[in-house]
Every structure is written in C-alpha cells, then in structure tokens.
C-alpha cells in the first residue's frame, strides 16, 4: 500500500510502498480517506531533538484522519463495515490505575499512533476498536479528519467555566485558533489571542476572537484597557510553549484566575512563582483528549452550530504531500488536508 514514512534519521518524509497492516481480534481495519498534517508531523519532518529521542525509524507517520471501516476483528462489537470513523491517537494500556478508574487520558503507558507505532498516513490503518469514534452523518470528512487537534482545543478550552469570562489565549496555531472559536461559541465575553504571525492572527479574528494581538506591535495591557478590562483575564489557555508568552499571561491574569497549559516549552522554563501564589492561580496541564467525553463534545459543538471550517486552508492529493508539508512549515497556513481517495 502507499504510505508516508519517516524512512531515514534526517530531515524529510518519504512516500513508500508499505505492507498492509495486520489486524488483531480487537482491531478495526480502516481505509483512509483524508488525513491532516499536525505540528507533531512537522517536528518529525524536521527531525528535531524531540523527534530524534522519540521516533523509531523507519515508521509510517500521521495521526489525524478519517476513513471507512473495511474489516472488523472477531471480538469487536458495535461497528459495521462501511462505518465512517476517526480515532483517538493515544493507545492506552487498560490496566494501570488511571485506566481502570476510567481516566484513560492519563494512562502512564500511552503509545501514540504515528509516534510510537505505525500511523495513519497510509491507505490502511489498524487501531483497537476501543479507540475508534463513529462520525455522525452531518459532519464532513474534512472536519472529521481534524478531530484530533480539534479535541486538543476543546479539552483545553473547556477545562474551566467560560460563560461570561474574559479569556486570554497565547499562541495562534491551529489549535489555539480553534480554541478561540470554542470559547466564543460557549459564551465567553472577551477572547483575546496573541502571537507574532499575522497570517494566523487574521485567521483567528475570522474565527471569532474579540482581538487578535501581534505582541511585537501592540501591548497586551493597552488592548485590555481598550476592551474595558480593569482586573485581568479570568481564564488563560497557553498554547504556544513560548516562555515570554506564559510570563505575559501570568502578568495579566486576574486574582483567582485559572490557566490550562497545552503548549510544551522547548526546555526548562523559569517563572515567577510569587505571581501564581499571591494571585491564587490554578494551573492545569492538558495532554490529548479525554476519552471519550471530549470526542462527544466535539461532535456536539459542530452539530450545535460551531463552524471551524475556516481553519482548513489547504487541500492536496497525497502524491503532493511535499507541498502540504511546505505549506505547514511556512507558517502561512491553517490545517492542511491530504486526500487519499
């Protein structure tokens, strides 16, 4: 079968002819229709330090997808041939304390599709049926293919009550932009997003941000004054992994504010803990999606009128994958879709 593989320990992704994956008794075989390129895939392409320490080579990559069930393991119940599915990319162990308590998103033995095991950038993918999520008929293939990153946005944004709150989002990548749309949809008052990438700030404004702030040109505190904010942000969503952005967030949070952190700093990050202590801030780390509460919320948000389609800015045939990766690496894109049909 046709697949995109991290074939060599150097920059790049390669098209290969890979064997069709074999199923187990509890698995589904999925024929891939569309995949989306994640920031993680860009890290793997670039072969940065994280990738060198994490990714086995060679390996089929990719974990954002939608496809059709074409074969079902003999122990699987609840799925039929032809079902349209996406899937949770974190394969959990099922036997650790958190898994047994129903907190599978906190499994300490997680394996990642397209990170630790063969991924979805292929004509066929095998995953445990437990990880598959049926896509409602009224949700398009395009939107279903980005449910994985949309889930990161939903999990982060809905960590705290947002109704009537002022929200600061640091980092206008696709996940941060989708989080801004979620915040507005569920009733936040002001949603301010910061970055230095004008293309993505414009996209964030289109998707519902009250203000998209280029912090290289504007002072965040001036924007707060312009919006009539006198006390600070109630909720912070840190999506960038940039220390200066997190420091700015701590400076502008209201007392008793709540911060959800999805962005991963590149190394150790020093912060002024006195601000956390004296402001009484709550900081919560976010990893992946809650299984499967986040997935049900994703579908329901779209079905209730949330439009995240503007975040999809580029489509390519899979044979044009290099153009897709070039678009993602340029920073002048939202989500990039590869068509496998």
Swiss-Prot record:
Single GO BP term: L-threonine catabolic process to glycine
Keyword Mitochondrion on entry: no
Residue sites binding Zn(2+) 1 per the record: 38, 63-64
Names of required cofactors: Zn(2+)
Positions of the catalytic residues: 40, 43
Primary location class: cytoplasm
Subcellular location as annotated: Cytoplasm
Cited InterPro entries: ADH-like_C, ADH-like_N, ADH_Zn_CS, GroES-like_sf, L-Threonine_3-DHase, NAD(P)-bd_dom_sf, PKS_ER, Zn_alcohol_dh
Name the record gives this protein: L-threonine 3-dehydrogenase
Gene this chain is encoded by: tdh
